[in-house]
């Protein structure tokens, strides 16, 4: 994940699901403009992509492999804690999931028992299948460290749980992450990009003033298990803020 080790090759769970989410969005756009032929093509791409993820990446231990390159015969069995980002995209856009519901629930439960359990403030980028921290980087390569994570990714993961009905768990995960950023380390107006990985202190290792952390404002819709349009409707959060500002 943006690092030499373990790297991403071939079929990648995180990237694959994001592409399927993009195809879902494009399918809806095509239907809205009356291009049913292209919409059906997008739907078929989603079906085929989801089947490829099932056939090549699903691991019976309850998650999608980090990656699998069928040409080179190389795979990474690390559990990527944020592999469900594409699921958040479809949920937040009010679109059908690209993956079977039981796979989504099982994967999130696995991440809860591994990546989330390894971090005092969010969820580690990676975990071993047995729930232990990943091995240290290989000689001559670099990585972010065994306990690293990105705050906006943690927000998306929290919303994954909310959209799957685990609102309290998702809220607590988001709270722990923001409490670490704002209260523990005082990064309130200097929001970080990535947290320290060599030890589980929750300190920033890189980045400041990262606007991707404004994903915070996506939480109200997820808490209510609504899509992104809901806060903009009459009486929604955005509508109330704008009316209050006009007074």
Where would I find each of the regions flagged by the language model?
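Aromatic- and acidic-residue-enriched carbohydrate-binding clefts of CAZyme catalytic domains
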Residues: 1-9
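Short, surface-exposed recognition loops and adjoining beta-strand edges that mediate ligand/DNA contacts
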Residues: 47, 52-81
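Active-site core of glycosidic bond-cleaving carbohydrate-active enzymes
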Residues: 6-7, 16-17, 21-32, 36, ...
